[in-house]
């Protein structure tokens, strides 16, 4: 039959974001600002004006780059909130600037770059010292980055 549909390449259909009313957002929560997943560090609401809704002023820090983003939106409007997943993997080795990580199921991931800056130096230092460490990887909006390191249990 030529009409058969092949689903083998499809994903689970889970969205990388979900909508939430602006007035329901809270400090230390997450929101998408200027297309980037951010943690809300500052939030203020202006009073309802003569010509419209109360406005919410949001200030967020990109969870991956640390860059600051701001946005203002009416309190009744919906904003996108990123679905954030955090996983811990055991560090096996570092090769050509990439991390080799062991998953809970015993599979090896080699697609994650060694982070730049202090965290990258700390991971490399502990690896070179022969310490067993776990790397915390945060995933949001089809991006994954190593965000923390801790000793293995």
From Swiss-Prot:
It is a peripheral membrane protein. Its main location: cytoplasm. The modification Hypusine is found at residue 50. Keywords: Acetylation, Cytoplasm, Elongation factor, Endoplasmic reticulum, Hypusine, Membrane, Nucleus, Protein biosynthesis, RNA-binding. The keyword Zinc does not apply. Pfam families: eIF-5a, IF5A-like_N. One of its GO terms (cellular component) is nucleus. Expressed in ovarian and colorectal cancer cell lines (at protein level). Highly expressed in testis. Overexpressed in some cancer cells. InterPro entries: IF5A-like, IF5A-like_N, NA-bd_OB-fold, Rib_uL2_dom2, Trans_elong_IF5A_hypusine_site, Transl_elong_IF5A_C, Translation_prot_SH3-like_sf. Binds to 80S ribosomes. Actively translating ribosomes show mutually exclusive binding of eIF5a (EIF5A or EIF5A2) and EEF2/eEF2. Interacts with DAPL1; interaction takes place at the polypeptide exit tunnel of hibernating ribosomes and prevents translation. Translation factor that promotes translation elongation and termination, particularly upon ribosome stalling at specific amino acid sequence contexts. Binds between the exit (E) and peptidyl (P) site of the ribosome and promotes rescue of stalled ribosome: specifically required for efficient translation of polyproline-containing peptides as well as other motifs that stall the ribosome. Acts as a ribosome quality control (RQC) cofactor by joining the RQC complex to facilitate peptidyl transfer during CAT tailing step. Belongs to the eIF-5A family. This is Eukaryotic translation initiation factor 5A-2. It comes from Homo sapiens (Human).
């Amino acid at each position: 039959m030529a009409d058969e549909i092949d689903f083998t390449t499809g994903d689970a259909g889970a969205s990388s974001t979900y909508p939430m009313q602006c007035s329901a957002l809270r400090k230390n929560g997450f929101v998408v600002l200027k297309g980037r997943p951010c943690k809300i560090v500052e939030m203020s609401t202006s009073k309802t004006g003569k010509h419209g809704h109360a406005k919410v002023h949001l200030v967020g820090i990109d969870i991956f780059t640390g860059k600051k983003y701001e946005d203002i939106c009416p309190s009744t409007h919906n904003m996108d909130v990123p679905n954030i997943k955090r996983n811990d993997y055991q560090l096996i080795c570092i090769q050509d600037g990439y991390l080799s990580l062991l998953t809970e199921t015993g599979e090896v991931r080699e697609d994650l770059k060694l982070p730049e800056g202090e965290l990258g130096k700390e991971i490399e230092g502990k690896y070179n010292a022969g310490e067993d460490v776990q790397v915390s990887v945060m995933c949001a909006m089809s991006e994954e980055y190593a965000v923390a390191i801790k000793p293995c249990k």
